[in-house]
Amino acid sequence: MITLQRTPLFDVYAKYGGKTVDFGGWELPVQFSSIKEEHEAVRTGAGLFDVSHMGEVEVKGVDSLAFLQRVVTNDVSTLKVGGAQYTAMCYENGGTVDDLLIYKRGEEDYLLVINASNIEKDYEWLASHVIGDAKVVNVSSEVAQLAIQGPKAEGILQKVVSEDLKEIKFFKFKNNILVDGIPALVSRTGYTGEDGFEIYCKSEDAAKLWEKLLEVGAEEGLKPCGLGARDTLRFEATLPLYGQELSKDITPIEAGIGFAVKPNKEADFFGKETLKEQKENGASRKLVGIEVIERGIPRTHYPVFIGEEKIGEVTSGTQSPTLKKSIGLALIDVKYAAVDTEVEIEIRNKRVKAVVVPTPFYKRSK
């Protein structure tokens, strides 16, 4: 019997009706009310997520920048204190170790936020490539993370923060600010396609903060949300999920996050040659949106065909709560990636007609 890991908020899930599942070795809530309700709450109001299963790694020291420049694809030298950056770590062949966020807290002080299922692998990979006096410390068990997302998120969070949240622009953060008296790092980031904030605090403070936010947000209809809605929201916004759109066999260029790859930065980094070649000349595969014309929902690993030729496979798919359509993301041969290309998806041994459509499926109005 495998013992599942739990976040510091596990004991409060039941109070709000949380139904838990095994997610990559973690016992996490898939939903509280319903995935559809929670999804709609984030698109129209606000939702609160426990994302404390995510990993956090500190990188400090005089050589911290030089080290990060070597192990990530984006250009960390452009990051200023108080800024966040989305990036990837790659193997030498261009395959993806993980995608992550980097927060620059000080000139020699960075916080890396990595995917829960990759914590041990990522930490070992980082530690094995350390240079100079850079120090890498896994602080995942000490840090909790809450995400408040949606058009009403700022107004709700503002009730328990004295600092003006409007000053925190997209992909910026403030460290050591008080949220209902609790010291936290607050960043204007998220994984839903909506405006919102991610709040990092000590593990022991997480439950109090969760309860307080739901209390002050009750009037605006703030809902606790689970992994189900987190997945449908990120999927509509076409934000990649490691293990589906990204993997050791899929490069960031193929996955459509080439903006986070800077092959011309001065530093050499793992995967540079492959990624430079793909960025300049195009990759042989491309992540595209697909809409099913007939009945059926595309799911991960379902094959995609043109005639008898298998041209790729679905990475994620669902019945979109916002668009009310059956849509998917698929990694396919670039020759067939043009919008309006007609393809077929094999769903339960039956070929179903689909068409390549533009992404992102959903983009919020500013």
Curated annotation (Swiss-Prot):
Keywords tagged on the record: Aminotransferase, Transferase
EC number: 2.1.2.10
Reaction(s) catalysed by this chain's protein: N(6)-[(R)-S(8)-aminomethyldihydrolipoyl]-L-lysyl-[protein] + (6S)-5,6,7,8-tetrahydrofolate = N(6)-[(R)-dihydrolipoyl]-L-lysyl-[protein] + (6R)-5,10-methylene-5,6,7,8-tetrahydrofolate + NH4(+)
GO biological process: glycine decarboxylation via glycine cleavage system
Family: Belongs to the GcvT family.
Subunit note: The glycine cleavage system is composed of four proteins: P, T, L and H.
Protein name, as recorded: Aminomethyltransferase
Source organism per UniProt: Bacillus mycoides (strain KBAB4) (Bacillus weihenstephanensis)
Gene this chain is encoded by: gcvT
